[in-house]
């Protein structure tokens, strides 16, 4: 999705293509999360006393690669790695494991969060709950059904 197609996906006219792209991201993040979940792992502590694991770092890197491959001119900001600045005016914000403490304790109540913004205005949101197989996507004025059983967002 580069060039003209990239711009079309960013437009209001192609929310479906953007939602389809976002619904494909669990294929990137879930295998990593499931590999690390309840496997025992070292925990590091950030300056704000929040925990971070190798799973957090690995998931964020994989999602950054997927986003950069499709949207190379966009900003990518995350919790665990340096910001990547682009020129498109669009930006992706990643929280690879929201609920790291639950993840560390082996509780399946955490998720991967991604947002798309332009000039500070939210355009799309993604919530994936990998251990319960639920993924939710919302794009601009379009809301999609949950991927699991059609529960409305």
Label for each model-derived stretch:
Residues 142-150:
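Conserved small/polar residues in nucleotide/adenosyl-binding loops
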Residues 53, 100, 143:
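Ser/Thr-centric signal marking residues that sit
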Residues 55, 128, 147:
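Single, functionally critical "micro-switch" positions that shape active/binding sites
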Residues 1-97:
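N-terminal subdomain of lithium-sensitive/metallo-dependent phosphomonoesterases centered on the IMPase/IPPase/PAP
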Residues 87-140:
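DPxDG-like acidic metal-binding loop motif
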Residues 69, 134, 149-150:
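Intrinsically disordered, low-complexity segments enriched in small/polar residues
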